A protein has these predicted regions:
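Terminal amphipathic alpha-helical/low-complexity segments used for targeting or macromolecular assembly
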Residues: 1-67, 185-189
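Short arginine-rich
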Residues: 41-43, 172-177
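Flexible, glycine/small-residue-enriched loop-and-beta-strand segment within the central core
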Residues: 47, 74-84, 89-157, 183-192
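Active-site/ligand-binding-proximal alpha/beta "capping" segment
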Residues: 157, 171-172
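Conserved catalytic segment of ABC-fold P-loop ATPases
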Residues: 159-162, 175-177
Length: 192
């Protein structure tokens, strides 16, 4: 493992943020643990103290637009690599593994049990055993609607005003102004 990074003076976090192979070391584990703790604080505050809940989100999420509503529970790897545009609504149980940036546009609607998954692992079993991973960003344009249970895989972009049907697994980019559904998701309708 150390041989792979022998000529690279960057930290694992720096390699991770650059989209290069890295190992989730103790420093990254600590950041992830802090994010997990904040998500639990957010859950407790959501009903009892909305102003406090908003402050917790502002400290957890990298960029948070006005009027964003996220129903708990919320699960993130770090939170700091997520940006959410104004007026976006996120229903219960979002999992956003933000090893790479996750950009959610303005006025999006995200159904329950959605997964935004940026990490990827080597296909080669020996490389995978060494715990090396990398990630690719996910981008959702403005006014995107993700139905319940949608899974978005690493490197995917979804264009403005598109709808992804419930239960879809999105493995490649989806253009603007369409409805896509299925596993793997494919465009089934052009919107006017």
């Amino acid at each position: 493992m150390t041989e792979l990074f022998a000529d690279d003076s960057r930290s694992n976090r720096e390699r991770m943020l650059a989209g290069d192979p890295y190992v989730a070391d103790a420093a990254l584990a600590q950041l992830s643990q802090q994010a997990l703790s904040r998500t639990y604080e957010y859950e407790r505050a959501y009903l009892e103290d909305p102003a406090s809940a908003r402050r917790i989100l502002e400290n957890l999420i990298g960029e948070l637009g006005t009027g964003v509503d996220i129903r708990p529970p919320l699960r993130v790897d770090y939170g700091s690599n997520i940006s959410i545009g104004e007026g976006t609504f996120i229903n219960f149980n979002l999992t956003a593994l933000d090893v790479a940036p996750i950009k959610i546009g303005a006025d999006c609607q995200i159904g329950p049990n959605v997964q935004l998954l940026t990490p990827t692992h080597p296909l080669d079993p020996e490389e995978r055993r060494s715990k090396i991973e990398s990630a690719q960003p996910i981008t959702l344009g403005d006014n995107v609607w993700l139905g319940g249970g949608v899974v978005i895989l690493p490197g995917v972009s979804i264009g403005h005003n598109s709808v992804i049907g419930a239960g879809a697994v999105v493995t490649r980019d989806i253009p603007a102004g369409v409805v896509a559904a299925g596993n793997p998701a494919r465009v089934i309708k052009q919107l006017a």
